[in-house]
Amino acid sequence: SLVGSEMCIRDSGSKEEQKKLDWLRKRPYTLLFLDGAHENYDLLAQYPVEERFGGRVQALGGNVYHVCRGSVLELEGKKYLCFGGTESPDKEEREAGYNWWPQEMPSDEEYAACEANLEANGWQVDYVLTHDAPSRFLDFTSLAVGESNRLHLFLDKVLLKLTYEKWFFGCYHKDVALSTKSRCVFCDVIPMGERHAKR
């Protein structure tokens, strides 16, 4: 399973959240997730980075992995560009290091790593999984929430240069297809692979 939205390493790192993570670690399947707005990035940074599935991930125990930004994973013969991160619209109302982390926005190094990985793959993947979306997806839709930020503009640049089949993003907590190639996902489960590629 791939999750394109914040998932496990949440704000407080409480015992209840640890219990949920422990439950996920015991599932009989591999779970990969992208980071979003409300991860506790200080806790997440404590997990070691390793090469797996063709890209960089952090193993959280069991079969749970955080996918590092800009990784191109290879799963069941398909390539996935994965890029987490977003900008909280309410960050001024949050407390740094408690329920908001500046690391929610990608660093220069993460943008550069993404471009280098795409270059190494000839700017071609099967699927794109991001937490946020290019501004070109958001403009003129009900998903638009203010001014474009650096991440939106970076994803615009990727969108214009990249060859891909479908792009999925999860930041906006809605299930809506924007086109045959782009979709906002919140609760929907989207099957991937050969038999589902024509959907």
Residue ranges and their predicted role:
Residues 10-96:
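A basic- and aromatic-enriched beta-loop-alpha substructure that forms the phosphate/nucleotide-
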